[in-house]
């Protein structure tokens, strides 16, 4: 039995500390939707998504009412479209994205992920077509998200793909110049991408996954901050233990909701992603958790150590609360989506270089960072390459979701609204890296990849 104190504590977390389920994401396999005729394949994709996810939003709303826990987003991830579309006669995969968008709109989800390709070791014909289609697809759809995996610890980094993605990010920004480059906010470049990630924009349904599955992403920076403030002045062991216990409680709630959703929908439960995911709302910030640990401002010296402690304690607590942990599982640092990070970047303390250092110890990478619109494709590729190298060498997922905001320069800001928030334009290095990123080929896998 639960004690009255535990019940009241959970109510307080929801009402006062912004505790919520960030997303219930249904993963759907589209491998049986392939067809030589592109139009038929698109129709099959639409039909399968609208059939499998017909009751997803309804189930989420019922669980919200039953348990009193806010579920912010209901989303869908699908098999990487490069795999499904490759057998078709299409030389542009935008119609596949449009079919996904229509299906997402029909079932009422706010995002659908999986306009994706896995090219860490090289390209197939379908991979090239999909990557070439990304700018148009993201500019002409509302709910579709795209991701491309360009590196892994086992295979090294496909630098041809890195350079091409620098160009694609630039094209995405230019196609949505009237919206501050919004298409870039729906595109992620990965190293060591997880196949069961419930969070956007990097979600897709991996080829080793079941026909259909429910994955859950939790959110609780406000809860962790409140707990950290209660142990002010204690030693690091006490601090870590406090975060660990708090993460346990948050993850338990995620597991409960995920299993309830899976049961209602008649599909298997997949994983809980332990990630602390901030929002632009006051009191829902990862940066403020780090500041509660004793930093004057997120981004100052000591930030990386504080984030390492936070990330590790979240994983340890969450792993005890669920048998099935997956996705990214750690602390997110999306600049435009975190009120504390926005503030730190505006005063110049949180820089691109510091964010890169922080990605060495957190769950993902350079996320939702706005940079000057005149940044070249080669510089974008070099930024991506740096981040991929961190992931490759350290056996971890890293990613880049970066926005070269058209017509904007340092001192300006971009406004996306909603969960995507807003961000100041931060500077990049002016020295180029064109000769390096255009060498071509693969950066070999590191020696530590030889594990067998």
From Swiss-Prot:
Pfam families: DUF711. It comes from the Bacteria. Signal peptide: none annotated. Disulfide bonds: none annotated. Belongs to the UPF0210 family. Homodimer. This is UPF0210 protein Dred_1672. It comes from Desulforamulus reducens (strain ATCC BAA-1160 / DSM 100696 / MI-1) (Desulfotomaculum reducens).
């Amino acid at each position: 039995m639960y004690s009255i104190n535990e019940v009241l504590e959970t109510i307080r977390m929801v009402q006062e500390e912004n505790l919520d389920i960030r997303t219930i994401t249904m993963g759907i396999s589209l491998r049986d939707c392939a067809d030589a005729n592109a139009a038929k394949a698109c129709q099959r994709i639409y039909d399968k998504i609208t059939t499998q996810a017909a009751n997803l939003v309804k189930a989420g709303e019922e669980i919200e009412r039953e348990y009193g826990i806010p579920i912010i987003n209901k989303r869908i991830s699908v098999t990487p479209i490069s795999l499904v579309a490759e057998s078709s006669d299409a030389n542009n995969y935008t119609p596949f994205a449009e079919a996904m968008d229509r299906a997402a709109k029909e079932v009422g989800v706010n995002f659908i992920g999986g306009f994706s390709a896995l090219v860490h070791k090289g390209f197939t014909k379908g991979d090239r077509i999909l990557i070439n289609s990304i700018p148009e697809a993201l500019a002409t759809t509302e709910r579709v998200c795209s991701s491309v995996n360009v590196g892994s610890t086992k295979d090294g980094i496909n630098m041809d793909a890195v350079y091409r993605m620098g160009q694609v990010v630039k094209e995405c920004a230019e196609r949505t110049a009237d919206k501050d480059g919004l298409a870039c906010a729906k595109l992620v470049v990965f190293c060591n991408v997880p196949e069961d990630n419930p969070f956007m924009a990097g979600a897709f349904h991996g080829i080793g996954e079941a026909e259909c599955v429910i994955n859950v992403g939790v959110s609780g920076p406000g809860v962790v901050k409140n707990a950290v403030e209660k142990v002010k002045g204690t030693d690091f062991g006490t601090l870590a233990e406090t975060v660990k216990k708090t993460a346990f409680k948050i993850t338990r709630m995620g597991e409960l909701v995920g299993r309830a959703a899976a049961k209602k929908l008649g599909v298997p439960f997949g994983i809980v992603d332990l990630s602390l995911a901030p929002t632009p709302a006051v009191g829902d910030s990862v940066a403020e958790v780090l500041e509660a640990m004793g930093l004057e401002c997120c981004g100052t010296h000591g930030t990386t150590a504080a984030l390492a402690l936070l990330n590790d304690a979240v994983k340890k607590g969450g792993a005890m609360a669920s048998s099935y942990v997956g996705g990214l599982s750690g602390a997110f640092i999306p600049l435009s989506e975190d009120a504390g990070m926005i503030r730190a970047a505006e005063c110049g303390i949180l820089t691109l270089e510091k964010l890169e250092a922080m990605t060495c110890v957190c769950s993902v990478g350079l996320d939702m960072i706005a940079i000057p619109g005149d940044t070249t494709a080669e510089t974008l590729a070099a930024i991506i390459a740096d981040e991929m190298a961190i992931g490759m060498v350290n056996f971890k997922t890293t990613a880049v979701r970066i926005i070269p905001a058209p017509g904007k320069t340092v001192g300006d800001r971009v406004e996306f609204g909603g969960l995507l928030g807003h961000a100041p334009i931060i500077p990049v290095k002016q020295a180029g890296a064109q000769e390096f990123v255009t060498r071509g080929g693969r950066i070999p896998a590191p020696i530590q990849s030889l594990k067998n």
